[in-house]
Amino acid sequence: MIETDKLAAPARVIAATPASSQEEAFERALRPKLLDEYVGQEKVRGQLDIFMHAARKRREALDHVLLFGPPGLGKTTLAHIIAREMGVSLRQTSGPVLERPGDLAALLTNLEANDVLFIDEIHRLSPVVEEILYPALEDYQIDIMIGEGPAARSVKLDLQPFTLVGATTRAGMLTNPLRDRFGIVARLEFYTAEELARIVTRSAQLLQARIDPQGALEIARRARGTPRIANRLLRRVRDYAEVKGDGTITREMADAALAMLDVDRVGFDLMDRKLLEAVLHKFGGGPVGVDNLAAAIGEERDTIEDVLEPYLIQQGYLQRTPRGRVATAAAYRHFGLASPQGMAGDAGELFGDA
């Protein structure tokens, strides 16, 4: 089967990526084990439930699954759930770790029938490793080279049927041949405040922390639609409630704790405000190219595109246009500025008013 406290606050408390191995272990403890326990992503859950039921009925390996979407939405959790629901073992790795064809071959040849191989950041597979993967996905076979130079020969090895679950935050970087070999492709979306409140309530129970519904909803509203962030904020608010109160997480206690953490009522932290203020003040509201924006705020281009922008765009504070990034009317209002005359209204907030 699947092999698999209080922490110092990470530098960016609303980062959607794990801050440390300790935090990853903490996440595993809170992770739902079965599909029925998984909150949100109703469409994806419904599809996987049917596909897994059919595969179990036929006693076959589940078709290969590609999960994509912003970080922290539950791709790794779903991979573990798939293995558990199918009653098989899970082997986990990531694209950057598989540097040589032999690394992948060693994993594949050790899989038992119908096992799940989970490759995180699959878009970062090297081309030479990806080539080895194609026949493994299609025919459950791999070709490996024995020997060197003129004496080298190719040997075909048969594999047990298996399921590859690939996860990526950048589906557009997958090559077409690799993408086409996944029979099940699912996009994970940001969660609603109500869904996140259910996750926060469940996590609080596992942590044996007292929380009322309004306290859970206040944390959920500021979690940027992301369960990983919601659970991290819950732990920090729990710490605050134990020191400053009687340990019960109320709306007022959550509001005070999150204000201390510099997380505002729409889930923005210092980095979000820094990006939007750069667009507004340094570039006159845009358009501004992502490379110029990265230089202005001292961040990597990938950080802006993968971590900061998705939520700002989803919330209607930033637009991505062919000419560059542009601040919306909602961004001007958020900072108490008058928007330029003739600017279209914002798209509204994902989670409503706090």
UniProtKB/Swiss-Prot annotation:
Residues 4-191 are annotated as: Large ATPase domain (RuvB-L). It is found in: Cytoplasm. It comes from the Bacteria. Keywords: ATP-binding, Cytoplasm, DNA damage, DNA recombination, DNA repair, DNA-binding, Hydrolase, Nucleotide-binding. GO terms for cellular component: cytoplasm; Holliday junction resolvase complex. One of its GO terms (biological process) is DNA recombination. It catalyses: ATP + H2O = ADP + phosphate + H(+). Pfam families: AAA_lid_4, RuvB_C, RuvB_N. CDD domains: AAA (cd00009). Its EC number is 3.6.4.-. It is an enzyme of class 3 (hydrolase). Residues 192-262 are annotated as: Small ATPAse domain (RuvB-S). SUPFAM superfamilies: P-loop containing nucleoside triphosphate hydrolases, Winged helix' DNA-binding domain. GO terms for molecular function: ATP binding; ATP hydrolysis activity; four-way junction DNA binding; four-way junction helicase activity. ATP binds at residues 30-31, 72, 75-77, 138-140, 181, 191, 228. Mg(2+) binds at residue 76. SMART domains: AAA. The keyword Repressor does not apply. Residues 265-354 are annotated as: Head domain (RuvB-H). PANTHER family: HOLLIDAY JUNCTION BRANCH MIGRATION COMPLEX SUBUNIT RUVB, PTHR42848. Has 3 domains, the large (RuvB-L) and small ATPase (RuvB-S) domains and the C-terminal head (RuvB-H) domain. The head domain binds DNA, while the ATPase domains jointly bind ATP, ADP or are empty depending on the state of the subunit in the translocation cycle. During a single DNA translocation step the structure of each domain remains the same, but their relative positions change. Belongs to the RuvB family. Homohexamer. Forms an RuvA(8)-RuvB(12)-Holliday junction (HJ) complex. HJ DNA is sandwiched between 2 RuvA tetramers; dsDNA enters through RuvA and exits via RuvB. An RuvB hexamer assembles on each DNA strand where it exits the tetramer. Each RuvB hexamer is contacted by two RuvA subunits (via domain III) on 2 adjacent RuvB subunits; this complex drives branch migration. In the full resolvosome a probable DNA-RuvA(4)-RuvB(12)-RuvC(2) complex forms which resolves the HJ. This is Holliday junction branch migration complex subunit RuvB.
